[in-house]
A protein has these predicted regions:
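Alpha/beta-hydrolase-fold enzymes
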Residues: 27-52, 199-278
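N-terminal topogenic membrane-targeting module
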Residues: 36-74
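N-terminal cap/lid segment of alpha/beta-hydrolase-fold proteins
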Residues: 73-127
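Intrinsic disorder
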Residues: 94, 104, 128-131, 143-147, ...
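Core residues of folded domains in eukaryotic genome-function proteins
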Residues: 96, 104-108, 130-133, 159-164, ...
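Catalytic nucleophile-loop/oxyanion-hole region of alpha/beta-hydrolase
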Residues: 146, 169-211
Length: 278
């Protein structure tokens, strides 16, 4: 019986590769089941706002289930990159780009998503209540067509938001017009973008609500903006969400240099070099 079973996986036997693939998929599935965990939340219990949010929402019911082919961080990254490229090819998203000139000569911008089925990009002030505005601050890549940004964009658009992706210096074919590139401390650039949108597209009667969302590096920049501006930020945005905020830049840098044979930092470095050459 044992010999018969082993013969099924003998190199050159019928459907050998199919059998190997089947075993691989089964093993991956078993690992994802093993890695499935209930989310745990660690927060200051004296924070009444967070305590109320935890109590009223269903966020504590969320369960982390790894994707079948993403049983490790590296596999997750590779699967994500493949999915992102497929999304760009088969379901590309178009944008209405608006550029903003900064006081020091630098250039930032906003990629406004078109409303579904229309060519309506940038918001328009109206005499009646209009769509709430949601500005997205992406991560290290800084592009508006990253899959994690696009997925949120589409979900928010279905919920009735006008979506714009903030583009910091040097991002996604923006012209480099000063001697400064974007970095984790670029909160003043974030401030300039938010105040530009507030002044240009939000009426003085505040018929439109305006929110900001930051992911990874974008979350770090947005958080620093709110810390530095304090209550003044509340006059510009009506709310903000930070996701995947890097709490230690030095540890994050070590991760890029030391993990996956340095592939992460090489990829980012190549992309940055290409952007500068353009």
């Amino acid at each position: 019986m044992r010999e018969k079973f082993l013969s099924l996986f003998t190199f050159g036997s019928d459907y050998f590769y199919l059998k190997v693939a089947l075993v691989f998929i089964i093993l991956c599935k078993l690992l994802t089941i093993r890695q499935t965990t209930q989310l745990k939340f660690h927060y200051n219990r004296s924070n009444r706002l967070m305590t109320e949010f935890i109590g009223r929402s269903k966020i504590t019911q969320l369960v982390y289930r790894p994707y079948l082919l993403s049983i490790s961080p590296l596999l997750q990254a590779l699967t994500y990159l493949f999915s992102e490229e497929m999304n760009k090819y088969f379901k590309p998203e178009e944008f209405d780009r608006e550029t903003i000139q900064l006081e020091d000569g630098g250039t930032v911008g906003i990629d406004w998503a078109y409303d579904k089925g229309t060519r309506n990009g940038r918001p328009k002030r109206t005499d009646t209540k209009s769509k709430p505005i949601l500005l997205l601050a992406p991560g290290l890549g800084g592009a508006s067509d990253n899959l994690y940004t696009i997925a949120l964009l589409r979900a928010a658009r279905r919920s009735g938001f006008k979506i714009g992706t903030m583009l910091f210096r040097g991002s996604q074919n923006l012209p480099i017009t000063s001697g400064k590139l974007s970095y984790s401390g670029a909160w003043r650039d974030c401030k300039a973008i938010l105040e530009h949108v507030r002044g240009k597209y939000v009426s003085s009667e505040k018929r439109e609500r305006m929110y900001a969302y930051g992911c990874s590096l974008g979350a770090q920049i947005l958080a620093l903006y709110m810390i530095r501006e304090g209550k003044r930020a509340c006059q510009v945005i009506d709310g903000a969400v930070l996701y995947g905020t890097p709490w230690s830049t030095s540890k994050g840098a070590d991760f890029f240099y030391k993990n996956a044979f340095g592939l992460y930092q090489k990829g980012i470095g190549i992309k940055l070099s290409e952007d500068i050459r353009k």
